[in-house]
Amino acid sequence: MVSTHSSQYITDFTPVPAEPGKSPLALLAKTCETIGLPEGSSKKNGASSSSSPQGKKDEKNHILHHQHHQQQQQSKQKSSPRSTPQSKEPTLTFPGLPKPSFPMGMPGMMQGFPFFNPMMTAYGCFPGAFPMSQGFMGAQRLPCPFAMMRQPCANPACVQCPSSSSNAAKNGQMTAEMMSQFAAHPLFSMYAGMMPGVPTSSYQALLAASAAASTSAGPTDYSNVASTSKASPQPKPTAQKSQKSAKFPCNWVDSDVPCGKVFDEENELASHVKKMHAPSPSSSASSEQSTSTGKASRSSTTTPHRFNPYGKPVAPAPPTMQQMGMNMAMNPLVLPFSLQAMYSNRLMSTVAHQ
């Protein structure tokens, strides 16, 4: 039996007419063109653009015009100062106040350069303290450190404070006259050698100048009386009587008790101080020689350089006066009136042990 049936394949193929605006490529192109446009324009121009190619051209022209307009607005905003955004960061200073200087708002740092603290200039310009202090010393004369700290001056030989000598005399302290009398004393000359950058001659000259400056207004000015009596060619009897009545008391304090002896001449006072209150150099030298020879004779039998494991540890030798002077010279804060404090401490320590 022969069966006649149709083929499994479609033989009468008729192509369906496809619209150009509904193809996938056309839809993709439409969505790419509408990106970045306002919502209203895409809805309005959607039908017209999809219907004809002229609508697509108009849509492209509209997009270009819109982009050009946005670029013009951005350029205007950059050029105009009113449209610049303001910073919202908090400011630490008010617009009417000056800006703080570096570091930490210290306004007086550059005034006292190279000293960051204005109080350091009083100590930095001391002779020999800093190599840069010579130029500052010649520029101006610095005030007294105690006056800058608003404290009573404790230096009896202070040239900047003329009332210090009278206050020291009232309080029972050492006055400038006593310091001028002891300027030639060996102990004072020894302490003067410890001062940083100040030789003995300049220290004695400083004492003499301070004594003359402080005692010029005082009632007991014996040096001026002697100088005027020597300078006058025809001295009057009143001047001779005043010269004879002038006496030189010894103000040396021993065990909290002043000497109290009175001399008519200054040479007698100086000799008395050297003989009674100053250690004789010959006796001290002889005692040092005897002790050194005794130590040498004792140590000759032993070997001090040999290490003994069972012996006691040897204590280090006490610092000599030269080493102490070098250490004090390295300290820039040592001032002339510290001599009185050091000497008074030594006297008080000896009194306590007695």
Curated annotation (Swiss-Prot):
Q: Which GO terms describe its molecular function?
A: zinc ion binding
Principal place where this protein is found? nucleus
UniProt keyword annotations, A-Z:
Developmental protein, Metal-binding, Neurogenesis, Nucleus, Transcription, Transcription regulation, Zinc, Zinc-finger
Q: Which InterPro entries match?
A: Elbow/Noc_ZnFinger (IPR051520), Znf_C2H2_type (IPR013087)
Chain's role: Probable transcription factor that regulates development of the tail phasmid sensory organs. Involved in migration and differentiation of lateral neuroblasts. Involved in control of cell fate in the T cell lineage.
Instruction: Report whether Ligase shows up as a keyword of the record.
Output: no
According to its UniProt entry, the protein's GO biological process terms are:
nervous system development; positive regulation of transcription by RNA polymerase II
Task: Please state the residue ranges covered by C2H2-type zinc fingers.
Answer: 248-277
Q: Which GO terms describe its cellular component?
A: nucleus
Q: What is stated as this protein's family in its record?
A: Belongs to the Elbow/Noc family.
Q: Is this entry keyworded Cytoplasm?
A: no
Instruction: Report which residue ranges the record marks as coiled coil.
Output: none
Locate the compositionally biased regions of type Polar residues: 1-11, 81-90, 221-245, 294-305
Protein name per UniProt: Zinc finger protein tlp-1
Q: Where in the cell is it found?
A: Nucleus
Q: Please list the residue ranges that the record marks as compositionally biased, kind Low complexity.
A: 43-54, 70-80, 278-293
* Stored PROSITE patterns: ZINC_FINGER_C2H2_2
Which residues lie within the region annotated Disordered? Answer: 1-23, 36-100, 218-247, 271-323
